[in-house]
Amino acid sequence: IGFEKNGYIIAKKLQTVINNNHKIETAIHKIKMKNKNEYTISPKLNPDNVKNIFLVDDVLKSGKTIIYGIKKILDYPVENLKTIILINRNHNQFPIGVDYIGLNLSTTLKEHIQVVLDKENECVYLS
């Protein structure tokens, strides 16, 4: 399950790698903000087929987005949930443990990280 836009793009790339290297069936889902602190998952998860979930996002700053995503996922009978973050900024305000991190990058609160994932570029900018 990838958070809308970049998290979803990263999740699709991970799904391709998994499908190309392992003989397991995977499904891809997008999680996005519906209202403030309320998220939806599409397509909807099948409660009878929810076993192992990877929750993917591009940048972890405070942890607020991922905590609300986990809250939504826990509405289902999940057996195993792992988190994957491309860039961890180390400014957690919530007790979030990330299972897989691309890069730990200690930044100031005034600095901004922009992840660009499109057909021409796959870049991370710090400003």
Task: Give the label of every model feature segment.
Residues 7, 42-43, 56:
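Structured catalytic core of nucleotide-sugar glycosyltransferases
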Residues 70-127:
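PRPP-dependent phosphoribosyltransferase catalytic core
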Residues 52-74, 78-80:
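Internal catalytic or translocation cores that form aromatic/hydrophobic pockets or channels
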Residues 12-52, 64-67:
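Short, glycine/charge-rich flexible loops or terminal/linker lids adjacent to PRPP-binding catalytic cores
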Residues 30, 55, 83-85:
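Structural beta-sheet core signal
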Residues 1-4:
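Short glycine-rich phosphate-binding loop at a beta-alpha junction
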Residues 7, 35, 88-90:
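Residue-level detector of flexible, active-site-proximal loop/helix-junction positions
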Residues 6-7, 61:
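Glycine-/small-residue-rich active-site loops that bind phosphorylated ligands and cofactors
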